């Protein structure tokens, strides 16, 4: 559906941008793009590890994120178009989930490597940037009608009085 694709595009844009910002903060501290060299940062940078966890969970499209609402809308539209597309969409979802978990584990867990010393904590501007990415995601997750409009009422699991008055 058009609304589902729009929802997914907005959610993907915010989530991907957040993940790229986090990758850049890792690069600025480790000076390498290799994930194996950036492992173990959770013990050194706990706040950055929290940002990584929230970004990965959003990328996984876990409830109640806006990513889940967009993915479910697109999946329903694709499945109604052709029953074979559910296989492709399912594989895509599985690969995305596996890579997101792999990325989180490789960069945050484990013992940090020998070349990491004197790691600077995240700056205020970096934390502000992460909040500026997460705030719209949380806002859209708590109120999907901002994107979906009246289509949210049509596909909502819980029909509220607000939806009844609009129809």
From Swiss-Prot:
RNA-binding is among the record's keywords: no
Catalytic activity field: a ubiquinone + NADH + 5 H(+)(in) = a ubiquinol + NAD(+) + 4 H(+)(out)
Keywords on record: Electron transport, Membrane, Mitochondrion, NAD, Respiratory chain, Translocase, Transmembrane, Transmembrane helix, Transport, Ubiquinone
Compartment list: Mitochondrion membrane
Membrane topology: Multi-pass membrane protein
EC number(s) per entry: 7.1.1.2
EC top class named in words: translocase
Family recorded in the similarity comment: Belongs to the complex I subunit 4 family.
Function: Core subunit of the mitochondrial membrane respiratory chain NADH dehydrogenase (Complex I) that is believed to belong to the minimal assembly required for catalysis. Complex I functions in the transfer of electrons from NADH to the respiratory chain. The immediate electron acceptor for the enzyme is believed to be ubiquinone.
Protein name: NADH-ubiquinone oxidoreductase chain 4
Organism: Carlito syrichta
């Amino acid at each position: 559906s058009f609304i589902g694709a729009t929802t997914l595009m907005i959610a993907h844009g915010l989530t991907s941008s957040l993940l790229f910002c986090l990758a850049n903060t890792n690069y600025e501290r480790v000076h390498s793009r290799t994930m194996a060299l950036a492992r173990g940062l959770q013990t050194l940078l706990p706040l950055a590890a929290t940002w990584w966890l929230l970004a990965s969970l959003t990328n996984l499209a876990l409830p109640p994120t806006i990513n889940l609402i967009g993915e479910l809308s697109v999946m329903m539209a694709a499945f109604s178009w052709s029953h074979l597309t559910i296989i492709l969409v399912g594989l895509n979802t599985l690969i995305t989930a596996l890579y997101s978990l792999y990325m989180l584990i490789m960069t945050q867990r484990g013992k940090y490597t020998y070349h990491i010393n004197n790691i600077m904590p995240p700056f205020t501007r970096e934390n502000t940037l992460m909040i500026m990415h997460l705030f719209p995601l949380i806002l859209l997750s708590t109120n999907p009608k901002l994107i979906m409009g009246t289509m949210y009422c049509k596909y909502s699991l819980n029909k509220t009085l607000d939806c009844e008055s609009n129809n």
